[in-house]
Regions:
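Extracytosolic ligand-binding ectodomains
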Residues: 2-396
């Protein structure tokens, strides 16, 4: 089912965010040869928003409602871009997402914003492609990008690139990678290796550990010895604070290898996920990357005033997706171009200014984002390098 938004208004500020979406799927990008849906300048543009409503999970339902709220905020903020926003429930699964895509096509959707999960995105993509419709997925899984799919979530590649550049600027060019066994760890390792190569740094060593406490603790001594022997002055961790990050860094500290003293620790995940993480002794002085903190705070404040609840960390993706659509419609109408969502317009190198920072889509369907660097400092996250406000700056 879908809900038709009664809001048709306009952009008092450009909008688009960063965040991360969930799930991994391995698939080839869908071939996209059909022309993109044309926009009638005299009619509202039908935009399909796909959210994981009807999942049966209370947390997911809350996230879905947050995304709907944020999307309606974006429509309300739009100026001279009539959007007919329709909301489709995906249930957070591929089967419902495919059915939602079929309904969206039948309803005349000219672009799809969402869905959240990579498996749902993979199910939606071929249905949308057949109708000549582009998909702005909330996922950060690069394997689903390409063809008619553009992902909005912050990717490992973007995070790794930002952190490597910061380390290189600080003279730390000999880098090690400590990663957990499994798909997620291997994916993060690959992103870091590519960032090291792109930025002229050196890979000192890469070492993995098993995802169970007993074996992780036993492996820590050997990992510490390997790091010391490599002479690495920066160490990347791919793991999350919700999994093994705290334990592996504490185990390294017990084996006399510590951040700042022996090397600069850096992480692909958000180390500000809780106050407990920020006071973890083994993470003090460590770096991680986040969307623009000042813009994020501004959006969160606006969201709470408008909706009476705190914004979910991923809700800005929905705002930014709808606002990007509005910006492209405005630009197309100003130039008399009926092809508002062409690849050339989507991949404009100037990108979009989002509610949590700048981002732009790449030709392969992935994205780049402007991120800030934060340092763990006795229970707080301190910004040591701001996010850029346009592409081409040092922090982009």
């Amino acid at each position: 089912m879908f809900l038709k938004s009664s809001l048709f208004s306009a952009l008092r500020r450009p909008a688009l965010l960063a965040a991360a979406a969930l799930g991994l799927v391995a698939c080839d990008p869908v071939s996209f040869t059909a022309p993109t849906a044309a926009v009638n300048p005299n009619q509202p543009v039908v935009v399909a928003l796909m959210v994981p409503m009807a999942s049966g999970n209370s947390d997911t339902e809350q996230l879905a409602q947050n995304m709907i709220n944020a999307a309606n905020m974006a429509v309300s903020d739009l100026n001279n871009s009539a959007i007919d926003l329709r909301i489709y429930e995906t249930g957070g699964n591929a089967e419902m997402a495919a059915a939602a895509a079929t309904r969206a096509v039948a309803d005349g959707a000219q672009i799809i914003v969402g869905p959240l999960y990579s498996t749902s995105t993979a199910a939606v993509a071929p249905i949308a492609a057949k109708a000549g419709i582009n998909v702005l997925s909330f996922s950060n899984t690069t394997s689903v990008a390409g063809g008619n799919v553009y992902i909005m979530g912050t990717t490992f590649d973007t995070i790794a690139d930002r952190l490597v550049r910061q380390a290189v600027n600080d003279g730390k060019t000999n880098m090690a990678i400590v990663y957990q066994e499994g798909v997620s760890g291997e994916s993060g390792k690959g992103s870091i290796e590519r960032a090291i190569t792109r930025n002229g740094a050196s890979l000192a060593t890469a070492v993995s550990y098993p995802l169970n406490i007993t074996d992780m603790g036993a492996a820590a001594s050997g990992i510490a010895d390997t790091l010391r022997a490599s002479n690495a002055n920066a160490v990347f961790f791919t793991d999350s604070p919700l999994r093994g990050l705290g334990f592996i860094t504490a185990s390294l500290a017990s084996n006399r290898f510590r951040t700042k003293r022996d090397a600069q620790f850096m992480g692909l995940s958000r180390w500000d996920s809780s106050n407990e993480v920020l006071v973890t002794p083994s993470l003090q002085g460590g770096w991680f990357a986040v969307p623009d903190p000042d813009l994020t705070l501004e959006f969160n404040t606006r969201y709470q005033l408008a909706n009476g609840i705190e914004a979910h960390k991923l809700s800005g993706l929905a705002y930014d997706g709808i606002a990007a659509v509005g910006a492209m419609i405005n630009a197309a109408r100003a130039s008399g171009d009926r092809n508002a969502f062409s690849k050339a317009r989507l991949t404009d190198p100037a990108g979009f200014a989002g509610v949590t920072g700048i981002f732009r889509f790449k030709a392969d369907g992935t994205n780049e984002r402007g991120l800030a660097i934060m340092q763990v400092d006795n229970g707080v996250a301190t910004m040591i390098s701001p996010a850029p406000r346009s592409f081409g700056g040092a922090g982009s």
